[in-house]
Amino acid sequence: MAKEKFDRSKSHANIGTIGHVDHGKTTLTAAISTVLHKKSGKGTAMAYDQIDGAPEERERGITISTAHVEYETDTRHYAHVDCPGHADYVKNMITGAAQMDGAILVVSAADGPMPQTREHILLSKNVGVPYIVVFLNKCDMVDDEELLELVEMEVRDLLSEYDFPGDDVPVVKGSALKALEGDAEYEEKILELMAAVDEYIPTPERDTDKPFMMPVEDVFSITGRGTVATGRVERGQVKVGDEVEIIGLQEENSKTTVTGVEMFRKLLDYAEAGDNIGALLRGVAREDIQRGQVLAKPGTITPHSKFKAEVYVLSKEEGGRHTPFFSNYRPQFYFRTTDVTGIINLPEGVEMVMPGDNTEMIVELISTIAIEEGTRFSIREGGRTVGSGVVSTITE
C-alpha cells in the first residue's frame, strides 16, 4: 500500500484529551478519528482498544504510556495524545513529552466534574496549555435538560477558577459511544466538537517564526577570528550581522553581533530553529561566554532566579530517589545545557514529597538563568535525574 502523502498546505496543531478517569477520553478519541475518517476518507479510524493499549515509552527516564492518534478536519491536521492512566497525564504534561496547543476536556454529564477534572485543569494552567474546549460526554444517559445545564455551569466555573475564560469556552454536548456506534445524531456532535476545536484553538506559531534563542552548549576560540558558541537553535532565525544578547549566569546581560554562522563546517547566511550551528561572535572573549547561557534576540528573554514550578518526582522504579524530600532540599536544576543549584520550598501544608508524587514548589537558584513560563527542567542529584518540572510563574 502506498504511503499517504502528508499535506503541508493544512495547518497543524497538537491536542489531547484530558479529564477524570472513565469519563470517556479514550472513547472520544476513537470517535473523533472514526467520524472524521468516515466523513473524508482521510486518516485512520482507530478502535478503542487500539488506543487503550498504548505502549510504554521512556521520556528522560520516566515511564509514560501515551497513545498518538492523527486525524484531519477540512482545515487542519491534528496530532492527538490520549493517556490510559492519571499518572501518565501528570508525567506527560509536566515533562512536555506531549506538547499541547489545546486540550479537549471530557466531562461525563452523568457525573459532573470530579477530582481529576480539577487536577487536569490545574495542570493545564501550570504547564501552559493555552486553550481548552469542553465535551460533555454521556449526554444520552441524562434525560433532564436542567441537569445538563447545571453540569455545564459547574465546568465553566471550575475553568474560571483556574483563570481559563470559563464564560467563553466552547461546550459541546454529546455521546462518544453513540457516535462510535454510528448514531447519526451523535456523529454530528463530534463534527460540531471538531468545528469548535478548529475555530477556538488558534494555529500555533511555528518555532521558526518566534524570536531567536539558542542555548550555548560549547565555546571555543578560533585564532584570528574570535569566539564561537555552538548549540542547537531552539527557536527563531539568526542571520549574519544580527545583534544578540548573552543571557544568564552573570550580573549583566551583554550584547554582541553574530559575524558568522556555520553548520557542518559550511558557512551559512542564516540558521533557523532545529539547526546545530556555531555562531562567531564579535568582540567576545573566550571567558565571557559559557555553557548554560543562551544567545537570544535582545530584549526577548530575561534572566531570573526565583520561580514557581509544577514538578513530577521520579519513583524508585524509574531510577529516582528512594526517600522523600522536604523544604530546603538543595538539588541541581538542569536547564537546557547546564546544572544550577537551587533551594526548594514546598507549598503550605505540604510536609514532604514522596517519589512518584507531583507537586507545586517554589525554587530559588543560586545564579540567574534565562527562563520563561513554560521552560522545562530536570532535577538532578549527583548526575542522576530525580525529577522533571516546568516553570509555571516567575517571581523574580
From Swiss-Prot:
Its main location: cytoplasm. Residues 137-140 are annotated as: G4. Residues 82-85 are annotated as: G3. Its EC number is 3.6.5.3. GO terms for cellular component: cytosol. Keywords: Cytoplasm, Elongation factor, GTP-binding, Hydrolase, Magnesium, Metal-binding, Nucleotide-binding, Protein biosynthesis. Residues 19-26 are annotated as: G1. GTP binds at residues 19-26, 82-86, 137-140. It comes from Bacillus velezensis (strain DSM 23117 / BGSC 10A6 / LMG 26770 / FZB42). This is Elongation factor Tu. It catalyses: GTP + H2O = GDP + phosphate + H(+). One of its GO terms (molecular function) is GTP binding.
